[in-house]
């Protein structure tokens, strides 16, 4: 399993202002374990390895992996 910004068929990650919205997007649409809003896009945790994710810098990935809101 992996973490990242899950993308839709058009290659875009859902934009967000609320983490609650992202948790629903990530768990119900992308079947991840959980999700939250990181830097204005939905960041998902526990995505299956075959899911497409946005190509982002290591710095941004580390920031979002580290900034988990429980």
Curated annotation (Swiss-Prot):
Protein name: Toxin Isom2
Tissue expression pattern: Expressed by the venom gland.
Annotated SUPFAM superfamilies: Scorpion toxin-like (SSF57095)
Record's comment describing the protein's domains: Has the structural arrangement of an alpha-helix connected to antiparallel beta-sheets by disulfide bonds (CS-alpha/beta).
Family under the similarity heading: Belongs to the long (4 C-C) scorpion toxin superfamily. Sodium channel inhibitor family. Beta subfamily.
Signal peptide, first to last residue: none
Primary location: secreted
Transmembrane segments: none
Record-level Gene Ontology MF annotations: sodium channel inhibitor activity; toxin activity
Disulfide bond residue pairs: 16-37, 22-42, 26-44, 38-64
Function, in words: Excitatory insect beta-toxins induce a spastic paralysis. They bind voltage-independently at site-4 of sodium channels (Nav) and shift the voltage of activation toward more negative potentials thereby affecting sodium channel activation and promoting spontaneous and repetitive firing.
Domain LCN-type CS-alpha/beta: 2-65
Taxonomic source organism: Isometrus vittatus (Bark scorpion)
SMART domains: Knot1
GO BP, one annotated term: defense response
